[in-house]
């Protein structure tokens, strides 16, 4: 099981993938897991940040051959070209990207886009093309789904966690998925035989801010009544 399979995929047989949602930490976590899959281990991995590197660098990565292997895996971050915030001076680059994504099936490389935006400009032709040509994954997690998703994610990565440990992890993370994943990283490093126990959570995950405040208030109240 892959982590992306925990969420709705529009075409999970298509390696070209768009991970789209407002949670950048979760998106990056899923993307990093995906590109490390065995099917991509022989590809040269290239990462392009559109905001820092620019669209010319992206186009070059998409059109130039790899120097180190037959094919590449191109990870695209901050793809502002899918939003409404594209300067008019970049029209040529937008046209070039349109041609590339129109003919994505001819591209021997694998393209993974991480779009950490709440909204994309669906009116734009380029956005429509990407949504059509890519396997689109929207990793949204409702509050009541946190426990099930986290447990499934942990299982997919080859770890086990007791129900009491899972509940404690969620509580100490204030039920925030980014914090849960961050704390889970600590637990993986400390896990013996890939097993996460309640004792491990207590030893490696601090009380949440809310729990600390509650403990301070409780201690103060107890002191007043003594």
Language-model features and meaning:
Residues 2-8, 14, 25-222:
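Non-catalytic interfacial helical region
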Residues 19:
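Hydrophobic anchor at the beta1->P-loop junction of P-loop NTPases
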Residues 22:
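P-loop (Walker A) phosphate-binding loop of NTP-binding proteins
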């Amino acid at each position: 099981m892959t982590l992306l399979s925990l969420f709705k995929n529009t075409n999970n047989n298509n390696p070209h993938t768009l991970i789209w949602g407002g949670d950048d930490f979760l998106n990056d976590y899923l993307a990093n897991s995906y590109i490390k899959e065995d099917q991509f281990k022989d590809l040269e991995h290239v990462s392009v940040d559109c905001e820092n590197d620019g669209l010319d660098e992206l186009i070059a990565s998409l059109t130039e051959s790899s120097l180190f292997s037959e094919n590449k895996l191109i990870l695209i971050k901050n793809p502002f070209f899918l939003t409404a915030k594209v300067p008019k001076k970049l029209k040529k680059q937008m046209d070039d990207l349109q041609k590339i994504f129109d003919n994505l099936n001819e591209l021997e490389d694998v393209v993974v886009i991480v779009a950490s935006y709440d909204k994309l400009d669906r009116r734009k032709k380029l956005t429509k093309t990407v949504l059509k040509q890519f396997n689109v994954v929207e990793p949204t997690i409702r509050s009541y789904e946190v426990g099930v998703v986290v447990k499934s994610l942990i299982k997919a990565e080859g770890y086990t966690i007791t129900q009491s440990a899972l509940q404690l992890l969620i509580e100490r993370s204030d039920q925030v998925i980014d914090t849960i994943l961050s704390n889970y990283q600590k637990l993986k490093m400390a896990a013996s035989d890939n097993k996460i126990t309640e004792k491990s959570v207590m030893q490696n995950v601090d009380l949440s801010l809310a729990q600390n405040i509650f403990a301070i208030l409780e201690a103060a109240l107890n002191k007043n009544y003594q």
